[in-house]
Amino acid sequence: MKLTKVFRTSQFKRDAKALFKKHYDPSKLAHAVAALMAQDRDELQTRYRDHALQGQWKGYREIHLEGDWLLIYRVQRSELLLILTRTGSHDYLF
């Protein structure tokens, strides 16, 4: 089932703005979000190493956009909603 809406938290917006100022490529983020919206499990598993998080982040998932650039997200299936929560490096996020 394809997701129909994207919600970006205010923290995600701040994280993304800071990364783009450091010349991270916004098209990589856009491509990953498109794969998430389409629920393309093959691409998410192989290209982005999609996995569930534990501990305080239980209920959230994480993908690797490149080396040490992560995207933390959550899917609310009842509303077909993708919630982009945080983005940044391991050191920055954890």
Question: How would you label these PLM feature ranges?
Answer:
Residues 1-67, 76-82, 87, 91-94:
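Basic, Lys/Arg-enriched alpha-helical interface segments
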